[in-house]
């Protein structure tokens, strides 16, 4: 399981299926050490987290031998500002903001891109509004980026759209980076409502998928290609 998580962290999703399944005996030589963290004991059960460290050169050699590209560079933290369009208004700090709530429910990732969410406190309300975030107000975005100590800000604007004629509903998510190596990069994603799907359900699904795609985009931009190296 630990090795699978390592592969998922480093290798683009499109190439993960090309790797052979490894027996435990093949994985063990790649492990440098492991330790138990966060131990919890009770009279009926024991809970603990295992932290594995792998030997970089052997993992690299395994991936290289199988012709798989991968990324190792960790991104500077990214502050995500989730703006939700509702009845003509743009919501960011308003309560409720279902898009912000959906992002808070996304499980923490051990990937290469640390995503941070705003606290939504008075300092946030003072420093930037939903309209300023969507408009890309450079001065205000720089203020919140510095306060949170991040390398870039990702504004993700979500809105429910209805197709003319068919009345089919979809959640459209437009993202744009400000600052960092991805500055100015934009993307638009559409998530169709399934039958009887609620708005709360689709924003949750969209948040998880966008989080995955943020990781995938970073890996694709930072791939190590061994044909260009001597290592």
Task: Give names to the regions the model predicted.
Residues 1, 48, 55-58, 145-204:
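Amphipathic beta-strand/beta-sheet edge segments enriched in Tyr/Trp
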Residues 1-20, 140, 198-217:
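Short, well-ordered alpha-helical segments
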Residues 28-40, 81-82, 133-166:
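A short, hydrophobic beta-strand-centered structural micro-motif
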Residues 52, 92-96, 134, 138, ...:
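Solvent-exposed, acidic/flexible segments
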Residues 63-73, 101, 105-114, 147-148, ...:
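C-terminal/domain-edge helix-coil "capping" segments
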